[in-house]
Amino acid sequence: AAVDVYPKEPSKNGEEFVTPLREFDNVILTPHIGAGTEEAQRNIGTEVAEKLALYSDNGSTLTAVNFPEVSLPAIRENVSRLLHIHKNVPGVMRQINEIFAKLDINVAAQYLQTTADIGYVVMDIHSNEPEKVVPLLKQIEGTLKCRILY
């Protein structure tokens, strides 16, 4: 599900947004986007839908406002793409790569960007069983979310 308008919204920037919907992995919450004209509303709706589809389909977060921006190439054959969101602290990338090394998994590509607080790394790996890697990545201290994109 995706939600853009909420019964009780923050009244100003920086105010914490609290809703029980934040607990669910299958819910996407976007900021309420106002528009002055029907055309602007349509265009904003189209742009938001395109950005969500791009994130959903390939992991790109280009033009994200409060999240690290990562622009990704098209899907490559014979790789699995993993998404890892973590606290931006020293040592996370080392631990991620140590897991791949211990499992003898070749990393085809890694794309990392950070903000002051959050790190977002997208990894294309050569593995027939990427589902075995995710539980290990989730155990890394500071991991906020990790999943297989494809």
Which ranges hold each PLM region?
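Rossmann-like dinucleotide-binding domain for NAD(H)/NADP(H)
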Residues: 1-74, 120, 150
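A conserved regulatory-domain signal marking ACT and ACT-like small-molecule sensing domains
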Residues: 62-150
